[in-house]
Amino acid sequence: MCLTCLLALLIMSNPIIANAEVAGLVPCKDSAAFNKRMVNSVKKLQARLAKYDADTPPALALNKQIEKTKTRFATYGRAGLLCGTDGLPHLISDGRWSRAGDFVFPGLLFLYITGWIGWVGRGYLLSVAKTSKPTEKEIILDVPLAIKFMSSGFAWPLAAWQEFSSGQLIASNDDITVSPR
């Protein structure tokens, strides 16, 4: 009985069964709406380009932008991204490792950046708490001090692990106030 339940659970949760095309998503290179978006984007840029003489700085900039637009759309098409009926690429996070690069790297980068911001802010607040006017330094930032913390924040995962393993990261129970209720 338990083996049957386990087998049924494995079959139902198999990520290979999940098919994004069923949800109305198609590869961007095959999407008519995606190709229409590219054509419309290029047409708008070409309409702006027609207002300028050739070899002028605005015309050169617009030509460069047209090439970048074509390259961007071609890259999306080659990357195997899936597009919806709106012609926009959609990220799929259904557990297939073939789609992991679409969201794992940006997700890890987001966590790193938010951790950096939090670690730098924590360091700044702990530092200004030791000054004579900590509230004032929280409202009016001490920019040189903040820059010092910002420049050292890139190694925050190592610093956090070091403080955690030494016991400095977590406050002792005696330092935590408890409500009398």
From Swiss-Prot:
A GO biological-process term: photosynthesis
Domain of life: Eukaryota
Primary residence: plastid
Subcellular locations according to the entry: Plastid, Chloroplast thylakoid membrane
Pfam family, one: PSI_PsaF
Assigned keywords, A-Z: Chloroplast, Membrane, Photosynthesis, Photosystem I, Plastid, Signal, Thylakoid, Transmembrane, Transmembrane helix
Membrane-spanning intervals of the chain: 100-120
Family from the record: Belongs to the PsaF family.
Function: Probably participates in efficiency of electron transfer from plastocyanin to P700 (or cytochrome c553 in algae and cyanobacteria). This plastocyanin-docking protein contributes to the specific association of plastocyanin to PSI.
Name this protein carries in UniProt: Photosystem I reaction center subunit III
Species: Pyropia yezoensis (Susabi-nori)
